[in-house]
Design a protein with these regions (language model features):
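Long, low-complexity or tandemly repetitive, helically biased scaffold regions used
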Residues: 20-106
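Short, acidic/polar
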Residues: 156-168, 250-253, 387-398, 471-479, ...
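Carbohydrate-binding surfaces of carbohydrate-active enzymes
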Residues: 78, 86-131, 137, 274, ...
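The substrate-binding groove and active-site-proximal loops of carbohydrate-active enzymes
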Residues: 148-157, 173-184, 227-249, 289-290, ...
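Aromatic-lined substrate-binding rim segments of carbohydrate-active enzymes
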Residues: 161-259, 361-369
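N-terminal carbohydrate-binding accessory modules
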Residues: 112-167
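Polysaccharide-binding and catalytic clefts of secreted carbohydrate-active enzymes
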Residues: 230-436, 442
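Sec-dependent N-terminal signal peptides
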Residues: 4-14
Length: 759
């Protein structure tokens, strides 16, 4: 026993001495980098990245110190994460040294870059940091002076000069129904005081939290008011008349004081991650499922009566024998097994329409008190990309209602909950990109002239994805492509540490293994934003690329067919590695937008459409638009009743047998329209699928720019060439200002950003 105790003591001393050795190395390398920063300054070479590295290290030294003294607390937090549960104590014990080793790697990389700058091996454009006090919105761009800018911050990050300077200055003000003091609509004095004393002149947004309601509402509007919810973040019944009274009073009492504040510039976020799931799935658990109130059921009865006119018509469609519409309640909730039936369609459509109506009301009430207000919602686009069964969320309609394209788009480094979340992206790709790519392309297709604001970016981590050993190149890949696809501002999830490294209270499973324990990951996000802002005009040009191919999306087919979005992804995936900026078409996009914005619409896996969707496509054909379609689409309406066939009078409807035929036809069609890129990127591999996604543009000054990202699991040999020229291209690495190979080998996650010219 004594020998064992002695061994433990020696092990502890060994770890302690090793940790002290790491700290000495950090101090030494900090001194080296500080000296190099001074030399760069003297040579008038931009050194902002090196200062960022020094500040990142300074912050994480405090974090590592706190972690050394709080192993038990970190052990508890690691136990909350599925992949770390069994080795939580080991993870917590090793964390401080992991952070220190990561800081040393960051310092080594920064020292190497600084030396290369000093010797002229690489070059760097001067970085102009965005002035958060002077941000303006110009259509779909954030500008600082005459230059586009991209803004980035973190959820819950403390406001200090050091953190604000290097990690974002977004100003967030929260209002909530809990601030309505009584049924008269009076606002709590502390809320008014806080608004009046807020003198910030920085860009920000108002977070309208729906999570807390005052106790008096349960007496005034009934106990059920707080029991019927839109879980997990809307804690009251939106169909109870009291909801409108409560929110009207909140806006009436707060918005007149908020309306001239700079932090309303990025709008009022009307709710956090909205969803209203009511369906059942046999005996399986449906996440965040909630019953509905009699108010909702009564609305549904009226909705059905307006739609179907008579109970006989409803019975005929639903295959029921109801006596009158008031008997509808006994058929609710709908079950997932009923998907594809008229009953399922009616409920899910009604559920979306009542939610749209609710947000239309909130926007109208807000505008009464601030006519210039912009609104957005923190919608999870995974509801769209994963074809969520019934969330009450119509992403297109709610984006049309918004003035800013709100979202909390995610990417997936891994899947830490495979039993709960099915995914198969890792068979071909190094990270899950479906939501990231399709989400932004869908938003950009709906409202191309609005900014995209990801107010809770899950590109780094989330409840289903996390890895303490994350490759920092993943960070660059995801944030780089997100901005090329249209992202303008983001608030990344998340920064739960205080200045001394201590943690916020009541942390759940979202913390352990995330960015506040990863110095290089944290650095790389800001490092990427520096490059994006340095080349902001070029990145904005990529954002505004014309989208010549539009993939048709039918919310009708999505409701009625569980795997509908898998088919849509199959189309998207086929074309995402051909250098083409992709977009979507819907009934509304076809009817409301200039059809010159695209060349062809692809329709695949879309059996069910409404008559209005059918008519929109038929009119598009009649006006000379081109459609490529599979033979299984546009067969029946929302209720399964057969539709007539689309007609073509100008040989502009192409009905093909396979997805491969559709892909080849789409590319040949663009070739005939001279709509393919001037640059060609060829993958020199034996693989039967491509993994390098790329886009190229020609700027207003005639420069050819090319961006490539390797989404695959293996390195790829590429060849860059011109589509219509014999000459060999000359490539220049824009970020490092040096020549680049026209036959690069890209590792997984690697970003290749070059200017391409003739030799």
């Amino acid at each position: 026993m004594i020998q064992k105790s002695i061994l433990v003591i020696f092990l502890f001393l060994g770890v302690s001495l090793f940790s002290q050795s790491l700290e000495k190395q950090i101090k030494s390398k900090v001194s080296v980098l500080e000296n190099l920063v001074e030399k760069l300054e003297l040579k008038k070479i931009d050194n902002y990245k090196e200062k960022l590295a020094l500040n990142t290290v300074d912050i994480f030294r405090k974090f590592a110190k706190w972690d050394e003294n709080n192993i038990d607390e970190n052990t508890k937090l690691y136990k909350k994460v599925t992949i770390y549960k069994k080795k939580a104590a080991e993870m917590a014990t090793n964390l401080p040294d992991f952070e220190k080793k990561d800081m040393l790697l960051l310092l080594d990389e920064s020292i190497q870059n600084a030396n290369e700058l000093l010797t002229g091996e690489i070059f760097r454009k001067k970085y102009i940091r965005p002035n958060w006090h002077k941000i303006a919105i110009k259509e779909n761009t954030l500008v600082n002076g005459n230059r586009p800018v991209f803004l980035s911050d973190y959820t819950w990050k403390p406001g200090t000069n050091q953190l604000d300077k290097y990690f974002g200055e977004l100003d967030v003000f929260l209002i909530s129904p809990s601030q309505v003091k009584n049924k008269k609509g009076e606002i709590t004095p502390q809320t008014i005081k806080k608004i009046k004393e807020s003198y910030s002149q920085k860009a920000g947004f108002v977070f309208v939290s729906q999570k807390n309601i005052p106790k008096w509402t349960l007496t005034e509007f009934g106990e059920e008011f707080g029991e019927i919810q839109g879980k997990p973040f809307t804690k009251y019944d939106i169909d109870n008349p009291g909801a409108r009274i409560l929110m009207s009073n909140l806006f009436k009492g707060t918005v007149p004081f908020l309306r001239d504040k700079k932090f309303t510039q990025l709008g009022y976020m009307l709710t956090n991650e909205p969803r209203w799931a009511n369906y059942t799935d046999g005996k399986k658990k449906v996440w965040f499922r909630q019953d509905v109130s009699n108010y909702t059921i009564k609305k549904f009865e009226i909705w059905l009566q307006k739609r179907h006119k008579t109970i006989a018509q409803l019975n005929s469609l639903w295959k029921t024998n109801l006596v009158n519409f008031s008997e509808i309640e006994k058929l609710l909730p709908v079950d997932l097994s009923e998907r594809g039936t008229p009953k399922w369609y009616d409920w899910t459509t009604f559920n979306e329409e009542r939610v749209i109506d609710w947000f239309q009301f909130l926007k109208a009430e807000l505008l009464k008190n601030d006519p210039k207000a912009k609104v957005h919602l923190k919608i999870m686009p995974s509801i769209f990309t994963d074809n969520n069964a019934d969330a009450g969320i119509d992403l297109e309609a709610l984006t049309e209602l918004s003035d800013i394209n709100g979202n909390d788009i995610a990417a997936h480094y891994n899947n830490i909950k495979p039993k709960k979340i099915h995914s198969d992206w890792d068979k071909k790709y190094v990270f899950g990109w479906r939501e990231l790519f399709m989400g932004y392309d869908f938003l950009k297709s709906i409202k191309p002239n609005q900014i995209n604001f990801n107010s809770e970016s899950h590109l780094l981590s989330g409840s289903h994805t996390r890895d303490l050993n994350m490759n920092p190149k993943y960070v660059r890949a995801t944030y780089w492509v997100a901005h090329l696809l249209g992202l303008n501002a983001s608030q990344t999830w998340y920064w739960p540490r205080q200045n001394d490294g201590s943690l916020r209270r009541n942390l759940t499973d979202g913390y352990a293994g995330s960015n506040n324990q990863q110095p290089r990951v944290t650095f790389e996000l800001e490092n990427t934003l520096i490059d994006l802002n340095t080349f902001s005009e070029e990145v904005t040009a990529f954002q505004n690329q014309r989208k010549p191919i539009r993939i048709f999306y039918s919310k009708t087919a999505a409701k009625q067919k569980g795997d509908y979005m898998d088919g849509i992804f199959d189309v998207y995936e086929r074309l995402n590695f051909e250098g083409i900026s992709l977009g979507f078409a819907t009934k509304n996009i076809i009817k409301k937008q200039d059809k010159a914005n695209w060349d062809v619409i692809l329709i695949y896996n879309t059996e069910h459409v409404t008559e209005t969707e059918f008519e929109a496509v038929q009119q598009y054909l009649d006006e000379g638009g081109s459609v490529i379609m599979d033979k299984n689409s546009f067969k029946s309406n929302e209720y399964g009743e057969p539709l007539k066939s689309l007609e073509s009078k100008s040989n502009n409807l192409f009905i093909l047998n396979s997805l491969e035929e559709m892909q080849l036809k789409a590319l040949s069609f663009l070739r005939s329209k001279k709509a393919l890129p001037e640059i060609v990127v060829t993958e020199k591999t034996d693989s039967d699928f491509k993994t390098c996604t790329w886009r190229s543009i020609k700027t207003a000054h005639g420069r050819n720019l090319l961006s490539i990202i390797n989404l695959g699991k293996n390195k790829v040999q590429l060849e860059v060439s011109f589509s219509n020229k014999e000459s060999k291209p000359v490539c220049k690495d824009l970020i490092n200002g040096i020549p680049a190979s026209s036959t690069p080998v890209l590792k997984p996650y690697e970003v290749y950003f070059v200017e391409v010219s003739e030799k």
